[in-house]
Amino acid sequence: MSKICQITGKRAMVGNNVSHSKRRTKRKFNVNLFTKKFYWVEQDCWVSLNISAAGLRTINKLGLDAAIKMAAEKGYLNA
């Protein structure tokens, strides 16, 4: 399971930890990602998605059908 949101396409970023003495060490900023099941009324089935918190807000705002269509158009989801 890759750490990529299937709705927004968000993935981990690389940055620096900066100490008080301003030394920089590499670190990873991970996505707030979780697996959630949704009931897709148009297809009459359950769909399991790896989504971020921002992806969940997108689904709440647009609806599941519109969010999945948008993600498929952008290439984040193979549906």
UniProtKB/Swiss-Prot annotation:
GO terms for biological process: translation. It comes from the Bacteria. Transmembrane segments: none annotated. Keywords: Ribonucleoprotein, Ribosomal protein. InterPro entries: Ribosomal_bL28 (IPR026569), Ribosomal_bL28/bL31-like_sf (IPR034704), Ribosomal_bL28_bact-type (IPR001383), Ribosomal_bL28_sf (IPR037147). SUPFAM superfamilies: L28p-like. One of its GO terms (cellular component) is ribonucleoprotein complex. One of its GO terms (molecular function) is structural constituent of ribosome. Gene3D superfamilies: Ribosomal protein L28/L24. Belongs to the bacterial ribosomal protein bL28 family. This is Large ribosomal subunit protein bL28. It comes from Parabacteroides distasonis (strain ATCC 8503 / DSM 20701 / CIP 104284 / JCM 5825 / NCTC 11152). The lineage of its organism: Bacteria, Pseudomonadati, Bacteroidota, Bacteroidia, Bacteroidales.
